Amino acid sequence: MNKQLKEFQEYLPKCRKIIALVGAGLSASSGLPTFRGSQGLWKNFNMIDLATPDAFYIDPGLVWQFYSWRRYGALRAKPNKGHYALSKLSHKFNSDEYITITQNVDGLSSRSGHNLDSLYEIHGSLFDLKCTSFMCNYVDHNNFKQPLTKALEDTEFEYSNLSTRKRTFGDSDGNDGVDISLSPQFNPVKTISEKDLPSCPVCHDLLRPGVVWFGESLPLNLITEIDSFVESDPSVDLILVIGTSGTVYPANSYVERVRLKGGKVAIFNTDIEDNILNGKVEDTWGFKGDAAELLPIALKPLIGDI
């Protein structure tokens, strides 16, 4: 057992209040692509460009094909040992003592049996749908129907055939190659009429994915509840930063607020700064590698075996 793990496991049982901050790195261990690097393309479109209100306004059929593909992938994926470790941890504490803040929209945390009272999906869920009409407040939670309409059924065929078309290419400078299996350029995007897309059963306007797109605000009610958890007494003893760098808002703000109140930070990620790994950052532990494998080991004093 290395020094950092020993110190962390000695501190963990003393904690009265814990936050787990979860990013895309944990879901990557379940086989889901991230929006970054060589996994950032879908049909030669930058995924980030499709995850915007403007993209949906310009071509809702294109955006719905992308999200139908993501929904199908998330349904095929299974929670990994990291998800189950956090699930067990959530049942060791009350919801005023422990929360998981996930930036993922794949639903894997909830499917792992996590205590829903202590789970905050701040970027929404692929399996929530909401009406686009300003005058309508219809929301459909936990809709796992796939495909949502007949026009979107081809996404299943594409996902199931990725392995047969997998190859990579890179540029002459040796930069990361692009995995064509995540960018199926040989199947051009279909043009889908709005009448063939998911529609609101109340007002018959278009439905959209219930996720927070780039440029949109995070849900105020969730952020308010999280802020209350962070600021209330007793102070947070520990924040687990899992599968994310924790350097982007609001993740970075939670880390810094915990530090300011005397709490400690434990990072589980494939990319961690050397000064953290070497124990040179005060009150911070770094565990480099696959968070799905590291979490069950690190949390064992509280959760036992997975």
UniProtKB/Swiss-Prot annotation:
Protein name: NAD-dependent protein deacylase
Domain Deacetylase sirtuin-type: 1-305
Keywords noted in UniProt: Metal-binding, Mitochondrion, NAD, Transferase, Zinc
Note: This protein may be expected to contain an N-terminal transit peptide but none has been predicted.
Enzyme Commission numbers on file: 2.3.1.-
Record localization: Mitochondrion
Family statement drawn from the similarity comment of this UniProt entry: Belongs to the sirtuin family. Class III subfamily.
Residues reported in the UniProt entry to bind NAD(+): 23-42, 103-106, 243-245, 269-271, 291
Top-level EC class: transferase
A GO CC term attached to the entry: cytosol
Pfam families: SIR2
The species this protein was found in: Candida albicans (strain SC5314 / ATCC MYA-2876) (Yeast)
